Amino acid sequence: MAKDDVIEVEGKVIDTMPNAMFTVELENGHQILATVSGKIRKNYIRILAGDRVTVEMSPYDLTRGRITYRFK
């Protein structure tokens, strides 16, 4: 997937699931299933319920995303 095709939105982590999956509520109210990107996983950045995050979504599947940044 090229970087041009990506949709970036902010959201809030609602629930944590097994295998580094998270339920994220976006700013527009939709809830999606998101996983952790490789750089966050590599640097052992912990994501907990209630954290504000940036999510990258593909225009082809708007129900899934990739967490790319956790706000402090």
From Swiss-Prot:
One of the essential components for the initiation of protein synthesis. Stabilizes the binding of IF-2 and IF-3 on the 30S subunit to which N-formylmethionyl-tRNA(fMet) subsequently binds. Helps modulate mRNA selection, yielding the 30S pre-initiation complex (PIC). Upon addition of the 50S ribosomal subunit IF-1, IF-2 and IF-3 are released leaving the mature 70S translation initiation complex. GO terms for molecular function: ribosome binding; rRNA binding; translation initiation factor activity. One of its GO terms (cellular component) is cytosol. The keyword rRNA-binding applies. Keywords: Cytoplasm, Initiation factor, Protein biosynthesis, RNA-binding, rRNA-binding. SMART domains: S1. The keyword Protein biosynthesis applies. This is Translation initiation factor IF-1. InterPro entries: NA-bd_OB-fold (IPR012340), RNA-binding_domain_S1_IF1 (IPR006196), S1_domain (IPR003029), TIF_IF1 (IPR004368). Belongs to the IF-1 family. Component of the 30S ribosomal translation pre-initiation complex which assembles on the 30S ribosome in the order IF-2 and IF-3, IF-1 and N-formylmethionyl-tRNA(fMet); mRNA recruitment can occur at any time during PIC assembly.
